[in-house]
Amino acid sequence: MRIVENKIIPFRGYLAINIFGIVFTRDLRKFNSNQANFRHEYTHTLQYKELWYIGFIPVYLYYWIKNLFKGMSAHQAYRRIPLEMEAYITENVERYNEHRKKFAWKKYR
């Protein structure tokens, strides 16, 4: 997983974003200081690979829009995306990604 520090991506208020398996962060030192950040983004990298990279964003947007239509706020809709749910729920589980089953995010649908 490649990590790139810059001042543009991600948007303010977010520490990191994973785009096609490349993690962009505003503060590399802060990102690296917490293993949960790394595990969260690495989970997304594995999800990208499972969905052949091009499938990740359509799946992500589908669930976000579906959640918005259910009346959720933008932030609630984001947190209820199955891809995000897996990453958040497991980010504090050491070695989770070493034993993770493919398409594990589907159990959060």
Where are these regions (language model features)?
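Metalloprotease/metallohydrolase-associated module, dominated by Zn2+-dependent proteases
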Residues: R2-L15, G55-R109
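Short, solvent-exposed loop/turn segments at secondary-structure junctions
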Residues: I9, R29-K30, W52-Y53
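Catalytic Zn2+-binding segment of zinc metalloproteases
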Residues: Y42-V59
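Short pre-active-site segment immediately N-terminal to the catalytic Zn-binding motif
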Residues: G13-N18, I22-F38, R79
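Nuclease and nuclease-like effector domains acting on nucleic acids or nucleotide cofactors
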Residues: M1, Q35, L51
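Short charge-dense sequence patches
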Residues: I8, N34-H44
